[in-house]
């Protein structure tokens, strides 16, 4: 009976992980689409990309609800062991992190849409920052699927990325600040909106860190004591 229950739990785990990684891919795709938007100079194509990202945000919400419901159902029907329960809870927590990461794609898109009348070149430095966060997101995805490399390596990388990104975005914002007309209200407002958008990008790295940390905890619950 114990072996049967273990097999059921492993099947449930496999199903949950499949849903989780499908959702993760969707979030990456949303940010890849955002990256295209930041680089696209054709106005009509930009409008199409904006519409696509908003639709992807709606799909993100549905995917998150589906994953959480499946996780709750797994807990209620299978009476999971401690290790299985830790994985299920981690998937729930990480799905919330992924939903927030997708939210940031949505929020950044709103920022770009609001300034659609401006030359796309004004977002050049934002492209660099976002590409950095997108690369970190992809590395996080790959590290969770790579059973050969220890997760501690990506945890160290995620920690390093957060520190490096702070230095990077300060340089970018300083450059923007030096180029604006301080007496022009619209330019000051743009800078404020830009700072908020940069912080959205920064949070992507924070949530990548959270996801790696959560999955590390499954393998070694004592690691952060």
UniProtKB/Swiss-Prot annotation:
Q: Which Pfam families match?
A: PhoU
Q: Cite the InterPro entries for this sequence.
A: P_transport_PhoU, PhoU-like_sf, PhoU_dom
Task: Choose any GO biological process term that the UniProt entry carries and state it.
Answer: negative regulation of phosphate metabolic process
| Protein name from the UniProt record | Uncharacterized protein MG409
Natural source organism: Mycoplasma genitalium (strain ATCC 33530 / DSM 19775 / NCTC 10195 / G37)
Its organism's taxonomic lineage begins at: Bacteria, Bacillati, Mycoplasmatota, Mycoplasmoidales, Mycoplasmoidaceae
């Amino acid at each position: 009976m114990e072996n049967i229950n273990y097999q059921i739990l492993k099947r449930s785990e496999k199903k949950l992980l499949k849903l989780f990684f499908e959702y993760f891919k969707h979030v990456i795709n949303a940010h890849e689409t955002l990256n295209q938007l930041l680089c696209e100079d054709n106005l009509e194509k930009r409008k199409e990309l904006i519409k696509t990202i908003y639709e992807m945000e709606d799909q993100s919400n549905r995917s998150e609800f589906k994953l959480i419901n499946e996780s709750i159902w797994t807990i209620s029907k299978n009476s999971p062991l401690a290790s299985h329960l830790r994985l299920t809870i981690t998937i729930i927590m990480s799905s919330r992190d992924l939903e927030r990461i997708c939210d940031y794609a949505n929020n950044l898109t709103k920022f770009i849409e609001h300034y659609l009348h401006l030359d796309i070149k004004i977002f050049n430095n934002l492209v660099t920052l976002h590409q950095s966060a997108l690369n970190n997101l992809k590395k996080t995805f790959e590290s969770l699927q790579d059973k050969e490399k220890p997760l501690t390596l990506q945890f160290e990388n995620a920690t390093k990325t957060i520190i490096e990104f702070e230095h990077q975005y300060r340089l970018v914002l300083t450059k923007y600040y030096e180029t604006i007309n301080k007496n022009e209200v619209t330019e000051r407002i743009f800078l404020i909106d830009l700072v908020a958008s940069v912080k959205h990008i920064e949070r992507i790295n924070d949530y990548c860190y959270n996801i790696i940390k959560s999955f590390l905890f499954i393998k070694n619950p004592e690691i952060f004591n």
